[in-house]
């Protein structure tokens, strides 16, 4: 969302050197980013995302994740896609050293 509006990266807005950023909820960060998007005169239309992780298996959590994102952004849950995948034991995610995600968003000028 920040990149779509050339607002810099997450570290610009929530630096890891700032104590307020330590341990902060990702949903709280998303709400604050949504505020910046709206302040810039845009709204989120939809999100299509993929989370790559060997473990944990995310399928049991997808519906709740969609609900949380929907509430944080103030958009319908039907407009949020979260898909889980593995990388078949390849790379750092395949070695269970981390998780990564990708997202494509559609924004509309309001």
Indicate residue ranges for each PLM-predicted region:
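RNase III-family endoribonuclease catalytic core
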Residues: 1-64, 72-73
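Short, conserved loop-to-beta-strand elements that form functional interface hotspots
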Residues: 48-53, 63-93
């Amino acid at each position: 969302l920040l990149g779509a509006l050339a607002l810099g990266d997450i570290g610009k807005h929530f630096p890891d050197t700032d104590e307020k950023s330590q341990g902060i909820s990702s949903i709280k960060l998303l709400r604050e980013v949504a505020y910046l998007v709206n302040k810039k005169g845009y709204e989120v239309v939809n999100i299509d995302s993929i989370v790559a992780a060997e473990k944990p298996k995310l399928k049991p959590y997808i519906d709740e994740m969609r609900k949380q994102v929907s509430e944080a952004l103030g958009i319908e849950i039907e407009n949020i896609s979260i898909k889980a995948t593995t990388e078949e034991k390849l790379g750092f995610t395949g070695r269970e050293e981390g998780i990564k995600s990708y997202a494509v968003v559609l924004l509309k000028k309001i």
